């Protein structure tokens, strides 16, 4: 089977294959949640191993299908009862399904051995498309976050097989939209990925989103996916733990077998070395001389602003908060903690609200910057989220981008792209929203930080009759958030340049 610009369907079309596969999936066990969906995976054989179940199919249409029940490795009552029994014996369970790693033998795995994918045929299935549409008729990205994280988890377990450690999402290193895919009803999506780097007990997983105008064959390899159809890239880091000792677990080594696989491996290796070095340093890097002058200029300028206007809005006034009780329907495959994709979705929805209210328009998601899950979120805990606009950047016609008009309207780090399919292909405003999350267990009055999510959105100038606003920090803490936001915008711009060349 050959691929050109689109993935062509085999004889009989995707419709019959799709219906047959969907019926087959309904009988599989889904250890992530009890919600079935219509996604496909590359594995077709039956297995009693939880990792072989189509867990990545459990997150689609969660809100629409939460009244349906599918077979599951363990109900919440089963997991709750077992945990109580183990606690009486002085034992702590990390996972209900993964209680024995089966083997500690380490071998080599190729990228092809962990390759997995999901099909989201929006063009062929209008009701599936309806579950992924937002109020503006565009892609509801929060739904996609759940699928990305669940697929990454499936890939992690395929790489570790036959061992069965407890794999958890340690960080989301970046999710970036490369192209606009506004009319998703005209496309069939494929989410596909594999392990791209391994350490001793950690692994990086790269997932890409592809958009095709034609129907998609239910079977293909990674090499057959055309790069020109990529609209999204995502990188996750997973870590493995031994369910018996609760310590790190040595995983299979990745063996790159092609030039491109070695390039991806070295890139990931360099990034992880940089991330480890940054973790040893202070969480906040001191401002440079240029940034110090910027902070001083912002402080002076903010003193003269007595009230906000349509073009100037205080950072403190951009805050949105949300508090959620963590219910077991959104638990991960291990039963006792909340699924990371659900957290990404909830944080995104709040960030979207903040960006939409700030711009009085429908923002378009551009990127999720590096995010580390500092603490897992237990089922039965209270999750508090606070979102605020931390940085804005105005992209104007190139001839007007060379000078800073104020400390709050600096020379942008990004440039208007000549590619009409790119998000930043026209004048507009880049809005960065920071979402801080904290968790509180009911048996204590103290809360602890769970993670910080940084989402970037773009609002075209053409979507608003008046100029889009700049965010105004007033306190030193807010100004440092602004400075860090500008650093992140520059980092994203550099990353886009790297992958474009």
Where are these regions (language model features)?
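N-terminal mitochondrial targeting presequence
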Residues: 1-71
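The feature marks the first
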Residues: 112-118, 126-130, 136, 141-168, ...
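C-terminal, well-structured subdomains that either form a transmembrane helix-short loop-helix hairpin
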Residues: 334, 342, 347, 351, ...
């Amino acid at each position: 089977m050959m691929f050109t610009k689109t993935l062509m369907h085999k004889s009989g079309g995707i419709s019959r294959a799709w219906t047959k596969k969907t019926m087959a999936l309904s009988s599989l066990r889904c250890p992530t949640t009890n919600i079935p969906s219509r996604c496909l995976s590359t594995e077709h054989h039956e297995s009693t191993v939880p990792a072989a179940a189509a867990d990545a199919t459990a997150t689609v249409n969660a809100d629409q299908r939460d009244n349906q029940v599918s077979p599951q490795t363990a109900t919440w009552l089963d997991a709750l009862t077992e945990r109580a029994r183990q606690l009486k014996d002085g034992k702590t369970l990390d996972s209900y399904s993964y209680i024995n790693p089966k083997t500690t033998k380490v071998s080599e795995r190729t990228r092809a051995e962990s390759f997995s994918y999901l099909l989201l045929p929006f063009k062929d299935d209008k009701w599936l498309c309806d579950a992924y549409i937002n109020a503006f008729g565009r892609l509801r990205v929060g739904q996609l976050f759940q699928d990305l994280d669940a697929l990454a988890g499936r890939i992690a377990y395929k790489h570790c097989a036959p061992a069965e450690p407890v794999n958890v999402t340690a960080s989301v290193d970046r999710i970036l939209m490369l192209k606009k895919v506004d009319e998703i009803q005209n496309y069939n999506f494929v989410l596909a990925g594999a392990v791209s780097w391994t350490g001793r007990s950690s692994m990086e997983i790269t997932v890409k989103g592809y958009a095709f105008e034609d129907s998609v064959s239910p079977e293909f390899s990674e090499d057959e996916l055309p790069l020109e159809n990529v609209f999204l890239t995502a990188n996750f880091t997973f870590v493995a733990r031994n369910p018996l000792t609760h310590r790190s677990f040595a995983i299979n080594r990745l063996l790159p077998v092609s030039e491109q696989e070695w390039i991806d491996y070295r890139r990931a290796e360099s990034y992880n070395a940089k991330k480890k070095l940054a973790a040893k340093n202070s969480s906040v890097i001191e401002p440079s001389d240029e940034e110090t002058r910027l902070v001083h200029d912002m402080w002076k300028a903010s003193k003269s602003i007595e009230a906000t206007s349509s073009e100037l809005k205080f950072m403190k006034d951009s805050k949105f908060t949300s508090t959620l009780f963590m219910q077991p329907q959104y638990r991960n495959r291990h039963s006792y903690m909340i699924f990371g994709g659900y957290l990404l979705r909830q944080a995104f929805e709040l960030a979207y609200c903040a960006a939409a209210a700030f711009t009085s328009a429908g923002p378009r998601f551009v990127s999720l910057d590096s995010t580390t899950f500092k603490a897992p979120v237990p089922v039965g805990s209270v999750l508090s989220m606070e979102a605020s606009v931390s940085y804005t950047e105005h992209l104007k016609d190139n001839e007007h981008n060379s000078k800073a008009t104020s400390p709050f309207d600096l020379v942008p780090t990004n440039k208007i792209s000549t590619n009409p399919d790119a998000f930043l292909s026209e004048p507009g405003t880049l809005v960065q929203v920071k979402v801080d999350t904290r968790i509180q267990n009911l048996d204590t009055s103290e809360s602890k930080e769970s993670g910080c999510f940084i989402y970037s959105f773009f609002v075209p100038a053409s979507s608003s009759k008046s100029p889009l606003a700049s965010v105004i920090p007033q306190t030193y803490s807010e100004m440092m958030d602004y400075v860090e936001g500008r650093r992140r915008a520059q980092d994203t711009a550099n990353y886009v340049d790297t992958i474009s060349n």
